[in-house]
C-alpha cells in the first residue's frame, strides 16, 4: 500500500513538473542560431522587389521592406555582426535612378552601391491582405525568397544562400475592417515578413510555439 502511494505521488509529481514545463514553453522563447553566418565582418546592402501588381496595391511595401530589413540586419548586437551597410534610403534612390536594376547582375548592383561585399535580395512574390474578391475579412499573406550574394566570393552572381518565407495574419478567421484597421494588418504582416526574411542571418529568439 505504501509502495502504491509512493508511485501515485511520483506520477503526480512528474505530471505537475511536465505541466509546468509546458506552461513555461508556451510563454517563453528559445535561441535559434543563424542559418547563414556570411555577414560576419562584411558590408552589405538590401534590395527588395515585387511585381507591378503588388506595388500598385501596396506602393510603400518595397521601400519599407528595404528600410526595415536593413535596420534589423545592421543591429550592432547581432551575432554574427556585419561591419557596415548601405543606408536603405541610398539604395532606394539608386533603384529610382536605375529603374532597370533588376535586370543587372548582383556584381554590378553591388559595385553601383559602393562595392559592398554582400548583396541581399528580398523578392516578394505574394502580398495581399484579403482573399481575392473578399474585402470583408482579412486574410493576409506574404511570401517570397531571400537570396544572399557573396560579391567577394568565387561566383558573385550566384546566390551563396537562399531561403523562403511564407507568413500570414491574422492568426484566426472572422476579423474584418470593423475589428482590425487596414493599417494594423499591413504593419503586422510586414513585421512578420521582415522577421522571417532576416532571422536566418543572425542568432535570435523565437517562441517555442511560433505563430508564424
Regions found by a protein language model. Name each.
Residues 2-12:
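Bacterial N-terminal signal peptides
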Residues 1, 120-128, 144, 148-152:
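Generic secondary-structure microfeatures
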Residues 60-61, 135-138:
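Short, glycine/charged-enriched secondary-structure capping and boundary segments
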Residues 14-41, 113, 138-141, 147-212:
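C-terminal/domain-edge helix-coil "capping" segments
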Residues 54, 130, 152-154:
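Residue-level signal for secondary-structure boundary sites
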Residues 40-125, 159-161, 188-201, 205:
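N-terminal segment of the mature soluble domain
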Residues 129-135:
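Extracytoplasmic/secreted cell-surface and envelope-processing proteins
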Amino acid at each position: 500500500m505504501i509502495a502504491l502511494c509512493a508511485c501515485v505521488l511520483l506520477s503526480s509529481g512528474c505530471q505537475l513538473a511536465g505541466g509546468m514545463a509546458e506552461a513555461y514553453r508556451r510563454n517563453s522563447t528559445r535561441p535559434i542560431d543563424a542559418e547563414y553566418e556570411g555577414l560576419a565582418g562584411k558590408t552589405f546592402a538590401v534590395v527588395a522587389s515585387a511585381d507591378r501588381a503588388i506595388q500598385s496595391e501596396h506602393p510603400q511595401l518595397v521601400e519599407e521592406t528595404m528600410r526595415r530589413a536593413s535596420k534589423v540586419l545592421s543591429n550592432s548586437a547581432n551575432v554574427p555582426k556585419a561591419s557596415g551597410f548601405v543606408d536603405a534610403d541610398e539604395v532606394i534612390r539608386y533603384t529610382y535612378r536605375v529603374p532597370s536594376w533588376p535586370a543587372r547582375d548582383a556584381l554590378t548592383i553591388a559595385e553601383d552601391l559602393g562595392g559592398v561585399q554582400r548583396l541581399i535580395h528580398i523578392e516578394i512574390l505574394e502580398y495581399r491582405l484579403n482573399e481575392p474578391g473578399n474585402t470583408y475579412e482579412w486574410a493576409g499573406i506574404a511570401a517570397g525568397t531571400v537570396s544572399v550574394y557573396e560579391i567577394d566570393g568565387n561566383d558573385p552572381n550566384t546566390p551563396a544562400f537562399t531561403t523562403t518565407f511564407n507568413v500570414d495574419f491574422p492568426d484566426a478567421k472572422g476579423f474584418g475592417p470593423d475589428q482590425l484597421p487596414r493599417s494594423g494588418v499591413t504593419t503586422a504582416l510586414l513585421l512578420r515578413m521582415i522577421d522571417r526574411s532576416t532571422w536566418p542571418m543572425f542568432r535570435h529568439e523565437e517562441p517555442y510555439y511560433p505563430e508564424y
